UniProtKB/Swiss-Prot annotation:
Anthranilate 2 binds at R167. Gene3D superfamilies: Nucleoside phosphorylase/phosphoribosyltransferase catalytic domain, Transferase, Pyrimidine Nucleoside Phosphorylase, Chain C. Anthranilate 1 binds at G81, N112. GO terms for molecular function: anthranilate phosphoribosyltransferase activity; magnesium ion binding. This is Anthranilate phosphoribosyltransferase.
Length: 341
């Protein structure tokens, strides 16, 4: 099936099969489709709403074409989000990665520069001094030795270059927002993924189940964050042992009062880094305490998913210890040094 045939099908409101989506995405990723065709296809998919087969097929192609990072550590975990929630919060999932590493985990962090928000994970790590151009073998050794490594998406998904122009010009959420978190180059099978709408929680968990994931939490807060919130309950779809279960996570159950999010939105990578460093240093200001709380609840989920804790509640307690001990700050320092040797 070529992209013109696929476009006609999707515009008519019909879903593509998984195999058909594999064909079309292969054409897109190999430069066989024009920018106009790619843009039209992305918009048509969005308007129809992407099916499980379509998302699965597209993810399979991206995974196949990715430049892999081979890591020997067990129970790798990733903390990431689709973006697009419009909240412009500081980089919570990026900060959480260092907390998980400090708690004894191995985090294969996958991310990019910002497309729609003020700062992406790559932007804030670059501002901190992490070398985004580190070779795959350096990233692998960082994950194994430091406990966290960063995989800059464009360096590992070079075939994506054909879709970059249409994505930027459209400036809309597309299937690629979902695919990024599902195409980790290290092949992680354990993840906490934030999404921009609760409607995506179950579908993404089911797709990851099809793709072989072991333990995943897909989260979206009731106040619209692609993170677990400290200001409202969050909707969660958890994939574990091949079964998807949906439930709410209430911050009050983890010792967090319903704190507002005032001051946690940022306009630059430097501002985001400032909030992260404040939380990592244990600053006692209200703002740093709020930042630490939202980092802890998200890191706690990842610590649990990574198999380091028997429950999310235990994971949150471990995250708080990693923050208060200064170990999370040390992990950030170690990654900066490791990638700049």
């Amino acid at each position: 099936m070529n992209i013109q045939q696929a476009l006609a099908r999707v515009v008519a409101g019909n879903d593509l099969s998984q195999d058909e989506m594999v064909e079309v995405m292969t054409a897109v990723m190999s430069g066989q489709a024009t920018p106009a065709q790619i843009g039209g296809f992305l918009v048509a998919l969005r308007m129809k709403s992407e099916s499980l087969d379509e998302i699965t097929g597209a993810a399979m192609v991206m995974r196949e074409l990715a430049t892999k990072v081979e890591v020997s550590a067990n129970n790798l975990v990733d903390t990431c989000g689709t973006g697009g929630d419009g909240a412009n919060l500081f980089n919570v999932s990026t900060a959480a990665a260092f907390v998980v590493a400090a708690a004894g985990g191995h985090v294969a962090k996958h991310g990019n520069r910002s497309v729609s928000s003020s700062t992406g994970s790559a932007d804030v790590l670059e501002a901190a001094g992490v070398n985004l151009s580190a070779a795959p073998d350096v990233v692998a050794r960082a994950i194994e030795n430091v406990g966290v490594g960063f995989m800059f998406a464009p360096a590992h998904h070079s075939a994506m270059k054909h879709a970059i122009g249409p994505r930027k010009e459209l400036a809309l959420r597309t299937i690629f927002n979902m695919l990024g978190p599902m195409t980790n180059p290290a092949g992680v099978k354990r993840q906490v993924i934030g999404v921009f709408t609760p409607a995506l929680c179950r579908p993404m968990a089911e797709v990851l189940g099809r793709l072989g994931s072991e333990h995943v939490m897909i989260v979206c807060s009731d106040d619209g964050l692609d993170e677990l919130s400290i200001a409202a309950p969050s909707h969660v779809a958890e994939l574990k042992n091949g079964v998807v279960t949906e439930f709410k996570v209430d911050p009050a159950d983890y010792g967090f009062g319903y704190s507002d999010l005032d001051g946690l939105s940022v306009t630059s990578a430097e501002e985001s880094l400032g909030l992260i460093r404040g939380a990592f240093k244990g600053d006692t200001t209200e703002l740093s305490q709020k930042a630490a709380a939202i980092i802890a609840i998200n890191a706690g989920a990842a610590i649990y998913v990574a198999g380091l804790a028997g429950s999310m509640k235990d994971g949150v307690a471990m995250a708080e210890d990693a923050l208060s001990s200064g170990l999370a700050a040390e992990k950030l320092k170690e990654l900066i040094e490791f990638t700049n040797v």
